[in-house]
Design a protein with these regions (language model features):
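A positional/architectural concept
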Residues: 1-61
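Extended aliphatic helical segments
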Residues: 7-10, 24-25, 64, 68, ...
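Acidic-residue sensor for enzyme active/binding pockets
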Residues: 13, 32, 70, 84, ...
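Short, positively charged
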Residues: 40-90
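Acidic/glycine-rich phosphate/pyrophosphate-binding loops and surrounding catalytic core
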Residues: 83-141
Length: 141
């Protein structure tokens, strides 16, 4: 019997994913993390990006907008600021939000407003990269 790891992905909206996986790939703050069963315990922040949950030949693609990742030897818990299935991303809306953030950054002298616009820009770029990756793999048209 193959060894698996339980995965829970939750956000303020509720549970996004719950199930077993052979491997999880998460967008950690310092880079991507590959998590297998029996991984050493770890607690780290997440940056906006693609979360991949691999089970056999199937891969579930989610988009997380930051949060916290807790790893135990037999359990991965993602407490996301927000999360959605990657196939549910509205590409046109993400592109419009990216352009709006760029415009806000261009005309902003206030550091706090600039930082907020920059965070929004990074989120939308990560969303668009996720859509592009799914399209390249033939999972989106």
């Amino acid at each position: 019997m193959a060894m698996t790891i339980d995965v829970q992905v939750v956000s303020a909206e509720g549970s996004i994913y719950s199930g077993a996986a052979d491997m999880v790939v998460a967008p950690g703050e310092m880079g991507e993390l590959g998590i297998l069963p029996r991984h050493a315990p770890l607690l780290t922040g997440l940056r906006p990006g693609e979360l991949r949950i691999i089970h056999g030949a199937e891969t579930e693609y989610l988009f997380v907008n930051g949060g916290v990742l807790e790893i135990q030897p037999h359990l991965v818990t993602v407490l996301a600021d927000s999360a959605e299935r990657a196939t549910d991303i509205d590409e046109a809306k993400a592109m419009a939000a990216k352009q709006a953030a760029e415009a806000r950054m261009a005309g902003q002298a206030d550091r706090m407003e600039y930082a907020a616009a920059q965070a929004e820009l990074l989120e939308q770029i990560a969303r668009l990269k996720t859509v592009q990756r799914l399209r390249e793999q033939g999972l989106l048209r």
